[in-house]
Amino acid sequence: MCRSPVFENLKHGTSHGIRFAIFDYQIVLSKFGTFCQTVVWLHWRGANLPDFAIGPGSWLGQNLLDLLTGRNDFHFESHPTFSKNHQIRGGNVSAIRELFTEDVLNFYEQHPGLSTEVSGNRLLYFRVKVRVEPDDIQSLLNEALQLLRLFQPANDEGSA
């Protein structure tokens, strides 16, 4: 059973031409408990990234991830720590693998507990069950924007 989600403390605007919203999100999932977290939502024109979700290895459990995003899992031999600590789910394996450059893999290793959901030109950035204090909101937004820049192809940086 899932109760209706609650959105609070909404802040929105534009940064470097990218629309954003930051909000506290709470949802109750009977099997998994209550999740309260601060989420950054980014929307940038011109991007067309594949649909995928990434989170810590224990993030919501294998079955829910499979249900939401497909069964494919990804492992990167060059980054065994990343592969051990993160699950990526999505359908377009080759397109998703292309996104996970050395810089992207290093970013996730340096930001433990990070969860991201991407679809086309939208990105959600959060840590499960972590609410961010008001003084740390700008830092969270900057992290999300940094990751977005890493996902953008080098020849497409101007379309943000």
Residue ranges: model-predicted function:
Residues 1-39, 43-160:
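Charged, low-complexity intrinsically disordered regions
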